[in-house]
């Protein structure tokens, strides 16, 4: 049986962890996330320096690890709670749902509300102040659609790993 409170706690923890690591990167130096900014902004600011590329990799690693590992971990917990009886579709839906929760949060709260609507100064890359691309809601909607595909693939990977090893 599906444990909705457990799903909500896993989703909430995933969103909180991923958001914390992502905000750390942007607040530390928004240029570390330059690859995720709208193309119009990338065109008017200098490319990442070698040091920024190195920092993006090392400081971004915890975010990437959480992004990939947590949905799989949560799906293992879901399978254990189901006494190993959850079928592949249930495992996929659970892993997809966890990954999709952050995708939805990232799109509506982080991208549309914070990045596009509020646009904190800490998120603005020097040299791009006031650029209209900071209000490019469609750019972030496209990112959400890509994130939805990513969530579906993460669901398949997570379900496959748990079905084989769980």
Describe the residue ranges of each PLM region.
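Juxtamembrane/disordered regions of integral membrane proteins
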Residues: 1-97, 101-166
């Amino acid at each position: 049986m599906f444990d909705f409170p457990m799903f909500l706690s896993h989703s909430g923890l995933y969103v909180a962890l991923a958001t914390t690591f992502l905000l750390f990167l942007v607040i530390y130096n928004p240029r570390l996330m330059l690859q995720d900014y709208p193309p119009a902004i990338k065109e008017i600011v200098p490319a990442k320096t070698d040091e920024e590329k190195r920092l993006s990799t090392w400081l971004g690693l915890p975010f990437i690890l959480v992004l990939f590992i947590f949905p799989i971990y949560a799906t293992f917990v879901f399978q254990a709670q189901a006494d190993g009886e959850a079928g592949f579709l249930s495992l996929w839906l659970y892993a997809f749902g966890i990954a999709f929760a952050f995708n939805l949060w990232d799109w509506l709260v982080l991208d549309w509300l914070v990045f596009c609507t509020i646009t904190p100064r800490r998120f603005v890359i020097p040299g791009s102040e006031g650029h209209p691309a900071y209000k490019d809601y469609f750019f972030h909607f496209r990112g959400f659609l890509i994130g939805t595909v990513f969530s579906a693939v993460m669901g398949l990977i997570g379900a496959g790993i748990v079905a084989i090893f769980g």
